[in-house]
């Protein structure tokens, strides 16, 4: 089982995903639960170096180069972590995946959507999540969280303006309509409230999966 979590910056993806992993461990005690993130991936030196370069405020790179670097890090992530874990029958939870590239590089940066989609289909060998959970929060709440928790330490992508994030959200709304496995959850509540919404949704969704 492969589940990805999506949303704009400071939407609570990382925190809620970790809480959801604890729930899955109780629901599927016989399964190993792997949590990871993009860009980068846990303990993947090469991909983490790309992450550091991408997020550094000191680097000025074009949207096209940004897209290629994200794709490169994703391929490393797949080869070294995601594919082996799935092959071993583990449950993989990933904070961001291909949909982030479509929303951020495609809609946010204005690159051709078909180009971004085709590139990522190629490098992933059409490996897509069984389920994607999009945490939908207000931009004002995202900015409030970034201001409280990160202050002047925001990375290059987090320093984008409101109009950029409006385009990114439009991208996620597009994916909600386009992908039958892509679902929107209201992320404006507390982490526990959002987790309850996800668990309630997952229980109903999983019950309909072919066994």
Curated annotation (Swiss-Prot):
Residues engaged in binding ATP: 7-14
Molecular function in Gene Ontology: ATP binding; dTMP kinase activity
Statement: the UniProt record of this protein carries the keyword Repeat: no
UniProt feature coiled coil, ranges: none
Alphabetical list of InterPro entries matching this protein: P-loop_NTPase (IPR027417), Thymidylate_kin-like_dom (IPR039430), Thymidylate_kin_CS (IPR018095), Thymidylate_kinase (IPR018094)
Keyword Kinase set for record: yes
EC number(s) reported in the record: 2.7.4.9
Recorded catalytic activity of this chain's protein: dTMP + ATP = dTDP + ADP
CDD domains: TMPK
The protein's role, per its UniProt record: Phosphorylation of dTMP to form dTDP in both de novo and salvage pathways of dTTP synthesis.
HAMAP family for the chain: Thymidylate_kinase
Similarity field: Belongs to the thymidylate kinase family.
Protein name: Thymidylate kinase
Lineage: Bacteria, Bacillati, Mycoplasmatota, Mycoplasmoidales, Metamycoplasmataceae
Gene: tmk
């Amino acid at each position: 089982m492969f589940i990805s979590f999506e949303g704009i910056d400071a939407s609570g993806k990382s925190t809620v995903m970790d809480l959801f992993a604890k729930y899955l461990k109780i629901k599927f005690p016989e399964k190993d639960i792997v949590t990871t993130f993009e860009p980068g991936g846990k303990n993947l030196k090469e991909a983490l170096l790309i992450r550091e370069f991408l997020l550094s405020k000191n680097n000025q790179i074009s949207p096209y180069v940004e897209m290629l670097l994200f794709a490169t890090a994703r391929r490393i992530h797949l080869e070294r972590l995601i594919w082996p874990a799935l092959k071993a029958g583990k449950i993989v939870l990933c904070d961001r995946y291909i949909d982030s590239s479509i929303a951020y590089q495609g809609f946010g940066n204005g690159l051709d959507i078909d180009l971004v989609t085709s590139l990522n289909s190629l490098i992933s060998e059409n490996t897509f999540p069984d389920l994607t959970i999009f945490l939908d929060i207000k931009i004002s709440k995202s900015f409030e969280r970034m201001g409280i928790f990160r202050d002047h330490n925001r990375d290059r992508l987090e320093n984008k303006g409101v109009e950029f994030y409006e385009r990114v959200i439009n991208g996620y709304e597009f994916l909600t309509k386009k992908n039958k496995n892509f679902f929107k959850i209201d992320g404006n509540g507390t982490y526990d409230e959002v987790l309850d919404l996800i668990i309630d949704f997952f229980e109903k969704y999983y019950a309909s999966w072919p066994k």
